[in-house]
Amino acid sequence: MDASFNKLYSKKIILKDFLENRLSIESKRRAMNDSHAKRFPRPCGLTIHSAVGCNLNCVYCYVPEIFGMNYMVPYGLSGEELILALLSNKYFFPTIYGTYLAFGSITEPFHPIASLKTFEYLYFIDKYLGNPVQFSTKFFLREDQINLFKKYRNISLSPLITLISIKYASILEPNAPKPEKRLELIRSLRKAGFKPFIFYRPLIPYKVFEEAENVLREAKRAGAIGVIIGGFRVTERIVMNLKKIGFTIEANIPKNFKGQYSLHLRKYKDSLIKISREIGLIPFKSACCANTYSILLNKGLRIPCSNLCFQKNFCTNCPVDCKNISVNVEMDDVRSAFKKIMNIEPDSIDIQRNIINISVKKKLSGKRRREIAIIERIFRKKINIIR
């Protein structure tokens, strides 16, 4: 595989210029001032918001605390405004080799309030960008909606169906579609030729975890090909809400914690990985790895995970076999990436199989480290800074 920053950057500039000439002054202003034009990508990719907020009132969810509301509002950008916002983002790059995109982080993308905007955004992402796209949903999709997915020719689509409980779904997710409808969606997606995954997140210890094997078996029977085993990030409100309905998890969290806390769940995750393999589901510890596998399934391309999970403790040795993919990188591309993204001229560059050693004079701040992570994603190699 060849990883070229200059090719991605040139494609980005050409598309950006085209849309700037096409859109009105007001549309350009909205796009360039929007958060999609400014945010750093997360490990799963750059999150795309087709709505803000959620009214499903899932007991374990932190979204109501982010926005201070339990209702949904469709996102304000048009499809082409979203594309310009992304192309205006210093840390976004187009094409299948570029930035992963993820729907479903702060809303339900296929809720009736959000679905039209979601499909609009998907259409224009496919038309202009062609990036890998992942969505997570609890909502059932009709046949005509699934058929819209078939029209996309450039993006690689990775469908994640969120399902953590059948027995307790009615109290954990009171306003969400029933688990049976989600299993039906998995069947419908497989029938239409797609390769859906079950998104097992959050992983709630004790009572919910006890039925995990049954949930995974039902998802496998419905046609899921793999499972993303997530973590669980809690707040005081979430802990109290769970306690009210009989789910006590205090043993897993420190006393008097403030803000958000991610539970330590390694033994639970390891157990689910083992169970998944036994029943024929491919397990993943992160959504980006499932997206990477979808690229192989959809496009026949073996591209290493954008988040470099194969160099961390997140790799589960899926069929992509990222660690054994040779990535060719040119020194001029590395120099250009540091100049364009960080405004830094490296003193020396040493490109090795899995690492790029960079010598710079400046001490790098926390933000600079995040920018280095962006460059790592382009080249699929760890960057080691030497001073």
Feature map (PLM): residue ranges:
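Short, exposed beta-strand "edge-strand" segments with a Pro/Gly-rich flavor and a Y/T-containing core
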Residues: Y71-L77, I171-P177, I275-R277
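Internal hydrophobic scaffold segments of catalytic domains
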Residues: A37, P41-I48, V52, V63, ...
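A broad, structural surface signal
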Residues: L56-V59, R217, R221, D270-E278
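C-terminal accessory extensions appended to soluble enzyme cores
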Residues: D2-L23, N241-R387
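Conserved Radical SAM active-site core
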Residues: K16-S158, K167, I356, K361-R387
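Conserved AdoMet/S-adenosylmethionine-binding subsite of the radical SAM
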Residues: E80-Y268
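Alpha-helix capping and helix-coil boundary motifs
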Residues: S78, E211, E330-D333
